Amino acid sequence: MKRNFVIIAIIFLFSFSVNSQKNNGMSSAVIDVENGMKNLSRLKVSDLGKIIRYIPLETPDDGLIGKNPVVKVLRNYIVVEYNTLPTQQGVCLLFSKKDGRFITKIGHTGQDPEAYTDCFSWTDEKEEFFYFERQPNQLIKYDMKGKFCGKVEFSTSELASYYLITDSEIIGFFDAFKKSNIYTNQYVLGIYKKDGSLKETVPSFFTYSSPHTDDIYQTNLVNGNLLYNIFGSWTRAGAFIFDYVRLGQRRQINPLHSARIWKNNENIRFKQDFIDTIYTVSGNKLIPSIVFKTGKYHWPVQERKSEKNNLERIFIADINENNSIVFFQCVRGLLTQESVLYNGLYNKKTGKTTLSKNKDGIEDDLSHFMPFKPLGMSTSGELVSFVEAWEALDWLEKHPEAKNNKNLSFLKDLDEEANPIVILIE
C-alpha cells in the first residue's frame, strides 16, 4: 500500500480547508456562501440551464416503479432503484434516456452467487457495467442487458459507502460509519485496480472515534423522500439517524451512499464533510480546486459533533457540478429542531453565488411547470429531478390552463398509476 503523501503538504491542505475565510493566495474558485446568505433570492430554472426536458417512463407490468425510488441518469440510460414493500427486496430498472422506454431489470437481491446485497448501483459507462455491493467485500457486475458478468473481490475487509468507476480504477469513499456500527480504518479514499487490489489510500482530514453502543438509545433508518425537505439530496438514498444519551452528542446523521466523489469531465472531485474545500484527485494527490467561503457560518471540524451554536453554522450537504455551474445544498442549524435547507448556485463564468431557501422552491420559468426539485446530476452534466404521476395530475387540477402548454404535452395522456416523469435541465 502506498502512502507517499508529503506530510507538510497534507498539513497545509488541512489548514487551508478548515479555515475557509482565507484563500492564502491560491487560485481556487471561491463560492461565497456567507455573502449569499446575506442576500437571499429565489432561484429560477433558467439560472440552472437553458433547456428543460420531460421524460415519462414507460409503465409495463414488469417495470412498475415502487415508492421512494432513487433515480440516476447516465449518458444513454435512466436507472431507477427502490426497495419493495413490505419485503424490502431491492429492484434496479433500466430505461431509455431518449424516450423513457423500459429496457430491462438488472440483477436481484438475495443469497445466490449472482445476487447483490443492495440495489444501489455504480456505473462504468465505458465498459457498460453496473456494480452492486455484496457484503462483506465484493461488488457484483451486470451489463446493460441485465446479464451477470462476475464480481470484484476487494483485498480490504470492508466495502466503501460510495464508489466512482473510472476507465482503469475503482475509487471508494469511506465515510467511516457502516450499517453495522463498525468504524473503518482512518483513510477516506481507497484507490483500487479493477481486480479489487488496493493501489493506494488518501488519509482522512480528521480522526473518527467509535461511540459506545451503550450510548445509543435509538436508531432509525429513514427513507430519503421523507428527509428531503430537511437534508436535501444528501440523504436521497436514506439515512441512519442515531440518538445518544452521553458524550455531549445527542444526534448523528449517517446518509447511505452519499456522493462525496464525482467526475466533471475528466476531473475527479472529492469533498469530505466539514472540510470547506473541493479537491481534484490526481494520482495520490489532492489539489484544492473550489472553496466554500462560509465566513461567520463556518463550522470548525473539531466541533463537528457539537450541537452548540449550530443555528449559526452552515453544513455543505450535497454538491452537483458541470462545466457551467456548481449547484449545492446546505443546511443551517444541522442537528437542531430549527434547521433550514438552502439551495445554492455558483456560476463559474461570472463567479456569482446565489442562495435561496429550499421551501421557496425553484421556479420553472422555462416551461411553467411545478417548482423544480433537484435530486442529482447526470453523468452528462444535466440536473435531474422527477415527479410522480399523481403529483403532476394534482398540480394540473389546480392549473388547468397548463393543458394548452405545448411544453407540457406529456400531461395529456398521463395516468395516476403511471411511472414517474424524469426531468432534466441542461
Residue ranges and their predicted role:
Residues 59-62, 106-115, 153-160, 205-209, ...:
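Short coil/turn segments at the loop-to-beta-strand junctions that recur within blades
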Residues 288-312, 348-380, 393-394:
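Conserved blade-ending motifs and adjacent loop-strand segments that build the rim/top face
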Residues 135-188, 197-217:
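Asp-box/WD-like beta-propeller blade repeats and closely related beta-sheet repeat scaffolds
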Residues 1-33, 94, 130, 146:
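Bacterial Sec-dependent N-terminal signal peptides
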Residues 65-70, 114-121, 157-167, 209-216, ...:
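Repeated scaffold domains used in trafficking and secretory/extracellular systems
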Residues 28-32, 72-85, 121-122, 127-134, ...:
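Short beta-strand elements that form the blades of beta-propeller/WD-repeat-like
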Residues 58-63, 67, 94-135, 152-157:
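Blade-loop segments of beta-propeller domains
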